[in-house]
Regions:
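Short arginine-rich
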Residues: 156, 173-175
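Short coil/turn segments at secondary-structure boundaries
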Residues: 176-180
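Beta/alpha (TIM)-barrel catalytic core signal, keyed to glycine-rich beta->alpha loops juxtaposed to Asp/Glu
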Residues: 1-167
């Protein structure tokens, strides 16, 4: 199987088209890997529509918003977390702002209402998105892996999916940035 990672929509289309140009000679693209979560929905702009059109599956990386969607950062940065690491803190920090906290609160509320965990709600949401084949989880121990795998039994009600869609709706500017600030 062949796949690509972090390609924008036009790059994905170009690679997939090139692969298809010689049937039987080149391997068809099976997947693309991009960051995708309730905190990062940018792939919905171009990458996901291209992947769906091309029959290429999406492997979302950081489906838990770099760990933030688990709720562990709601009251501070745990000492044993990636956010406390000097090396990884810059990776986590962009998702510790006010808009992200509103999304994390919505995930926690949904989890409480479903008697499950925020991790499971966030992972189920991304798992059920169109074009997603399998979220990539970064479990650091057996307990985290077990919890992530148990999401297979969770089905989110439509009302919760819609509420999470609404609170995390991306702002798409023409075409990809706010030109009024230039």
């Amino acid at each position: 199987y062949a796949g690509v990672s972090n390609f924008c929509g036009w790059q994905l289309a170009k690679a997939a088209t090139w692969q298809l140009a010689s049937p039987g000679v080149r391997t068809r693209l099976a997947s693309t890997q991009m960051e995708y979560s309730l905190l990062q929905r940018g792939v919905e702009r171009e990458v996901l529509p291209a992947a769906l059109d091309l029959g290429v599956g999406l492997l979302p990386s950081s489906p838990l918003g770099r760990g933030v969607l688990t709720g562990k950062y709601r009251t501070g940065t745990p000492a044993d977390s990636r956010g406390a690491s000097e090396l990884l803190a810059p990776f986590v920090e962009p998702y510790l702002d006010d808009p992200a906290s509103r999304i994390v609160d919505a995930v926690a509320t949904a989890a409480d209402g479903l008697a499950t965990t925020a991790l499971q709600v966030a992972l189920a949401w991304v798992r059920d998105r169109p074009g997603v084949v399998a979220p990539i989880v970064g479990a650091r121990n057996a307990q985290q892996l077990t919890e992530a795998l148990s999401v297979e039994a969770l089905s989110l009600p439509d009302e919760i999916c819609q509420a999470l869609d609404d609170v995390s709706a991306p702002v798409h500017r023409y075409p990809d940035q706010d030109w009024s600030t230039l």
